[in-house]
Amino acid sequence: MRLILLGAPGAGKGTQANFIKEKFGIPQISTGDMLRAAVKAGSPLGVEAKGYMDAGKLVPDALIIGLVKERLKESDCANGYLFDGFPRTIAQADAMKEAGVAIDYVLEIDVPFSEIVERMSGRRTHAASGRTYHVKFNPPKVEGQDDVTGEPLIQRDDDKEETVKKRLEVYEAQTKPLITYYGDWAQRGEENGLKAPQYRKISGLGSVEEIRERAFEALK
């Protein structure tokens, strides 16, 4: 099972990724984790990546693809792998294809942007303990106060409506085109000797369990 998980920030990809990893016994491939591990290990690609990161520059796609290919050779990828948060752009998807990285499924978790804004901007956090609430879905007993300590709850900057909307705009511009890219490739079939992935789209609305069952059904 080799798959890419697509969906906007706040669509619930992380939660579903955990279910998929457990069910199929595959690792989640995170480019951030890979970069940190390569830098720490001092591998040639890691040293090169560190140069870009220390200069505050983006690590080039070609270098990231090199790290991906190295990572996929490890024994835990024998039964497959799950990409979450990569590729983010058409250029990265093209680079993956050219590198011969095989993908069986592309699974999109579809949630309307208005729902994502409500989900994320309604979050409230107790700073000291990390306990989280939601003004609509999981409200505290007393508005604005932590259930255990009675201390005030905060809204993290990441959860503020304007921040959420900006993240969704970036997703719309950069990553959403991948949905068309993989959908079209699935229809065209094999290219350059690489089998086209099957494209699946599920609704990300409903309970966590309902979405999990939809995901498992889509990956049969």
Swiss-Prot record:
Catalysed transformations (reactions): AMP + ATP = 2 ADP
Location within or outside the cell: Cytoplasm
Residue sites binding ATP per the record: 10-15, 123, 132-133, 206
Record-given protein name: Adenylate kinase
EC code(s) of this entry: 2.7.4.3
Pathway per the UniProt entry: Purine metabolism; AMP biosynthesis via salvage pathway; AMP from ADP: step 1/1
Quaternary structure note: Monomer.
Alphabetized InterPro entries for the sequence: Adenyl_kin_sub (IPR006259), Adenylat/UMP-CMP_kin (IPR000850), Adenylat_kinase_CS (IPR033690), Adenylate_kinase_lid-dom (IPR007862), P-loop_NTPase (IPR027417)
Keywords per UniProt: ATP-binding, Cytoplasm, Kinase, Nucleotide biosynthesis, Nucleotide-binding, Transferase
GO function term, MF aspect, one: ATP binding
Chain positions covered by the region annotation LID: 122-159
Residues the entry annotates as binding AMP: 31, 36, 57-59, 85-88, 92, 156, 167
Superkingdom: Bacteria
GO biological process: AMP salvage
Species assigned in the record: Burkholderia vietnamiensis (strain G4 / LMG 22486)
Region described as NMP: spans on this chain: 30-59
